[in-house]
From Swiss-Prot:
Taxonomic superkingdom: Bacteria
Protein name: Ribosomal RNA small subunit methyltransferase G
Function of the protein: Specifically methylates the N7 position of a guanine in 16S rRNA.
Lineage: Bacteria, Bacillati, Bacillota, Clostridia, Eubacteriales
HAMAP family, per database record: 16SrRNA_methyltr_G
Naturally occurring in which organism (per UniProt): Clostridium perfringens (strain SM101 / Type A)
Top-level EC class as recorded in UniProt: transferase
Annotated binding of S-adenosyl-L-methionine, by residue: 78, 83, 129-130, 148
NCBIfam families linked: rsmG_gidB
SUPFAM superfamilies: S-adenosyl-L-methionine-dependent methyltransferases
Any single Gene Ontology cellular-component annotation: cytosol
Record has S-adenosyl-L-methionine as a keyword: yes
Record-listed E.C. numbers: 2.1.1.-
Locations listed in the record: Cytoplasm
Amino acid sequence: MQYFDLMKKACDSVGMEFNEDKYQKFMLYKDLLKEWNEKINLTAITEDEEIVKKHFIDCIKAFKADEFKKAKTVIDVGTGAGFPGLPIAIMREDVEVTLLDSLNKRINFLNEVVNKLALKNVETIHSRAEDGARKKELRENFDIATSRAVANMCVLSEFCIPYVKVNGNFIALKGPNITEELNDSKNAIGTLGGKLKGITEVEIEGTDLNHNLVIVDKIKSTPKTFPRKAGNVTKKPLK
């Protein structure tokens, strides 16, 4: 129970319940992450305490956005090693979480975690973001699309906003210093049917890190021309 108090403090700060069962799930997730990371590249963060702080607590802090407390369906686009989707699923067993990633090896890892943690509320999908968003069963089908992927907001918006229902939200987990990036992405967000709602700063317990939650309202349907074909989204970001 080495990290229980630290994680509970983080949960308390965003109004989320934490208990021993959730803690044990996070610890098993940590062990699987370290084990699989020796076979495939999942994370550069490999020390137990750093995983707890910079992965788990960072994702738990997403609940500072009330939207994550109310949503019934969430898709994590470009989920990688499962962040923030898996922590959201552990914290809220009543929300349906879809994890989407383009690399099959990562999907195999995620399936292992879902099975070992006995998570009944998680589905994994092997797909590129721009391909998945063109599928009828996924497009504009989620209360929230989220991503912690390392990409510019213009790019992330085109990857994520098409998945969001009208009146839902796209929420990006970003680092500090995002003012310029957001200014550059406002037109793109609007083109895709979104409108910037606000930015929520979060502190990560036990570190000097400050991160930001960028919250976008989906106010109208995304034009059928988006997302563009593979490659164009990153090569020629919307402006």
